[in-house]
Amino acid sequence: MLPLSPVLAQPLATAAASSMGTALWHALVLGVVQGLTEFLPISSTAHLKVVPLLLGWGDPGVAFTAVIQLGSIVAVLAYFRSDLQAVIRATATAMREGRWTDPSARLGVAIALGTLPIVLAGMALKLWFPGYEDSVIRGIPSIAIVSIVMASLLALSELVGSRRRQLSSVLPRDGLLVGLAQALALVPGVSRSGSTLTASLFDGWERAAAARLSFL
C-alpha cells in the first residue's frame, strides 16, 4: 500500500481529530444529562434520546445509553456501600444459620428477586425483538405519551398510598414488585426510579423507605 502524501494526510488527521473532539463533547454533555436525571423520577433514557435530537446530533442508540449509565451505577454503589455491606453480611449469616428474621437479610433476598425481571425482560427484547432500537416505541411521540402517563401514576400514588411501611418490614415479594416496575424502564419515557417509587408508594411505603428500596 502506498503511503499517503503529506497533502492528503494533514486534512485527514485534522478531520479525525475534529471528529474525536466532537464525540467527546457529545459524550460529556450526555453524561451530564444522565447524571442530572438518573436520580430524579424522570426518565434519563428519554432525555438521552430527546436532548441529542434537539441539538441536532441524532439518536445516540441503545448501546451508548446503556454504557453511559455505568457512572450512575458506580455512584449508587459508592453512596450505599455501607447498606450493601450490611445486606451482604446479614444475607450470608441467614443462609448459614437458616434464619431470616434480620430485615437486612430479607432486604438481600428482595434485591436479588428485584434484579431478575429486568434481566429477563432485557434478554427477551434482545432475542425476540431485534428491531426494538428502531421501533416506534423509541420515537419522540411515544416517549412523550409514556412520560405523561408515568407522571400521572406517580402523582396518584402520592394521593392514595398509605406511606406507613418501613424497610424493617420488607418481604421478598416487595423486591419482586419493585423489580417488575423496574423492568418497565426498558421503555423510553419510563423512569427507573420513577416506576419503582410509584410501585412502592402504591404498596404503602413511606417516601424515604421507598426511595432507599428503589435505589438499592
PLM ranges: what are they?
Residues 1-216:
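Multi-pass membrane proteins that catalyze or facilitate reactions on polyprenyl-/lipid-phosphate substrates
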